[in-house]
């Protein structure tokens, strides 16, 4: 994206709209994931042909690049019509200016990502010697409740299971707000 901003390379963007230029100059992995499954993978069949609900779970940031804060967004201009279709199909309320409420299942997908990345990053830290097994167990103690003598896999498994239970409880507790599109926080209250 920095390459396109260099004066010698801006001519490559000459035929694009300002919004398309914004997409290219603010490349975002979340938007690319939607583009990839909706059109690039199995492109001859029109993408992976996932259900609207499956695509909805990918949308942590259901807005375009011009609405992005901190660079996070899910919709390139090339997927804007798809997003409008998904919003209509899934009943996602428009928040105006190419911005929609999140699909309720996106909160569960986000929590699953958080659980896996956080716990596996800690496990990797033990394996490469950055974190001791004692510190690993101590960090995950609120989720795992096992002794420091347990192996990494057991601690991970128990911590993931308990984190999932926590997410389910939070989802149930805030179900009405989630379904109304009013939740603006993570479901996982992770201890580390």
Question: Language-model segments: which ranges?
Answer:
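Sequence-structural signature of the catalytic-core scaffold of metal-dependent phosphohydrolases
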Residues: 2-155, 164
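C-terminal subdomains that position terminal phosphate/3'-OH groups for nucleotidyl transfer/ligation
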Residues: 144-192
